[in-house]
């Protein structure tokens, strides 16, 4: 059983330290055990130089086998067959070291490809990089799959299409066929064999495919009733908008002004939202400073009074905003959900001079 690296808090006893130094000096066990031993000694406070003087393992070699042993442990924990583990111990520390840039789930299948294709460290390095680049693509290319072999085959196919030199193109085609895992990927590469003498054609670019990662990036369109002073009938007559999934499609049947708002929680909770505009010095609690316009979001569905909210009420046919300690006699037109000030720009001229903007 290959030993597990100890935690940084673990301290070797003098007897354990001597035993590890002696085992490494005589290179007992496999390279995996050497890597675990070097890591245990380093975690116990022994420098790489001291380990070199005691065992003959140079600093660079210590680093490689320590990292490779960690890769081996992650592969072993994936439940792979024993023959693959035996291949890794073969020794293949240089091969496993190149797989360090992959995730734990990728390392096991990458090691299987290394075993099946008899890859050396340079081939393993190319495989790992191809897998990383393939994973960054916005979508899986046509005819290829997520298998690591197809990832290398895709890189070879793409490079071969751009090569004019016949020898280079032939070499890349052979490489792609060697690694292609799926039948569709192999067919894609074999198509290049039918016309080796022609100039490479430019492949169609990938679609600019994106997906929203955060709900707050999706704006919500809210109908606008107007600015105060405003007739109550005007506020109530603005038709509500219906948004259709999955892209919040809005169909406006009448001439209605709209304003976009972020998908904040208090905006999303509105059952029948409408926007009005007002001035900071005319709010129920005036805001100090220079007067400026504000956007006020009302929910016309919320007409039940509570003493924790501000409301818009009908005052002789006009919209009036206020807070009420008790239920008002006037008709409640809607609850105030949001009062938003405009974005503050310190120096608008700076926006027109890119060289003055901060990095």
From Swiss-Prot:
Give the principal location in a single coarse category: cytoplasm
Question: Mind listing the GO biological process terms from this record?
Answer: carbon fixation; photosynthesis; ribulose bisphosphate carboxylase complex assembly
Which keywords are on file for this protein?
Carbon dioxide fixation, Chaperone, Cytoplasm, Photosynthesis
Q: Map out region (N-terminal alpha-helix) in residue numbers.
A: 12-195
Residues covered by region (C-terminal beta-sheet) = 219-345
Q: What compartments host this protein?
A: Cytoplasm
Q: NAD among the record's keywords? A: no
| Keyword flag S-adenosyl-L-methionine | no
What Pfam families does UniProt report for this protein, alphabetically? Raf1_HTH, Raf1_N, RuBisCo_chap_C
The record's GO CC annotations read: cytoplasm
Q: Which InterPro entries match?
A: RAF1, Raf1_C, Raf1_cyn, Raf1_HTH, Raf1_N
Q: Subunit structure of this entry?
A: Homodimer. Forms an RbcL(8)-Raf1(8) complex. Forms complexes of many stoichiometries with RbcL with and without RbcS. RbcX and Raf1 can bind simultaneously to RbcL.
Family recorded in the similarity comment: Belongs to the RAF family.
* UniProt free text on domains: Has 3 domains, the N-terminal alpha-helical domain, an extended flexible linker and the C-terminal beta-sheet domain. The 2 C-terminal beta-sheet domains are swapped and pack against each other to form the dimer interface.
Q: Which HAMAP family match?
A: Raf1
Can you name this protein? RuBisCO accumulation factor 1
What gene, per UniProt, encodes this protein? raf1
């Amino acid at each position: 059983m290959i030993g597990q690296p100890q935690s940084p808090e673990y301290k070797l006893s003098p007897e354990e330290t001597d035993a590890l130094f002696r085992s490494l000096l005589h290179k007992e066990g496999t390279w995996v055990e050497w890597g675990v031993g070097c890591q245990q000694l380093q975690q116990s406070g022994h420098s790489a130089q001291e380990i070199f003087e005691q065992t003959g393992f140079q600093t660079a070699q210590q680093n490689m086998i320590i990292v490779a042993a960690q890769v081996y442990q992650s592969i072993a924990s994936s439940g792979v067959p024993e023959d693959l583990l035996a291949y890794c111990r073969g020794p293949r520390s240089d091969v496993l070291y190149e797989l360090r840039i992959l995730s734990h789930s990728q390392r096991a299948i990458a090691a299987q490809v290394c075993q099946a294709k008899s890859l050396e460290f340079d081939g393993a390095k190319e495989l790992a990089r191809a897998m990383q680049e393939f994973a960054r693509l916005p979508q899986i290319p046509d005819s290829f799959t997520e298998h690591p072999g197809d990832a290398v085959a895709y890189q070879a196919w793409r490079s071969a299409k751009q090569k004019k030199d016949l020898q280079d193109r032939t070499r890349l085609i052979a490489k792609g066929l060697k690694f292609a895992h799926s039948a569709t990927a192999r067919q894609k590469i074999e198509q290049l064999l039918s016309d080796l003498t022609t100039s490479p054609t430019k492949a169609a670019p990938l679609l600019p495919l994106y997906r929203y990662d955060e709900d707050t990036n999706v704006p919500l369109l809210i109908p606008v009733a107007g600015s105060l002073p405003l007739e109550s009938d005007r506020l109530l007559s603005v038709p509500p908008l219906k948004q259709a999934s999955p892209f919040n499609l809005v169909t406006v049947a009448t001439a209605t002004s709209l304003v976009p708002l972020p998908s904040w929680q208090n905006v999303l909770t509105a059952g029948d939202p409408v926007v009005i505009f007002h001035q900071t010095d005319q709010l129920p609690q005036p805001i100090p400073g220079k007067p400026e316009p504000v956007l006020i979001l009302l929910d016309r569905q919320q007409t039940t009074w509570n003493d924790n909210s501000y409301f818009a009420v009908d005052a002789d046919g006009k919209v009036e905003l206020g807070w009420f300690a008790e239920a008002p006699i006037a008709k409640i037109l809607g609850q105030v959900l949001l009062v938003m000030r405009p974005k503050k720009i310190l120096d608008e001229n700076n926006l027109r001079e890119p060289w003055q903007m901060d990095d």
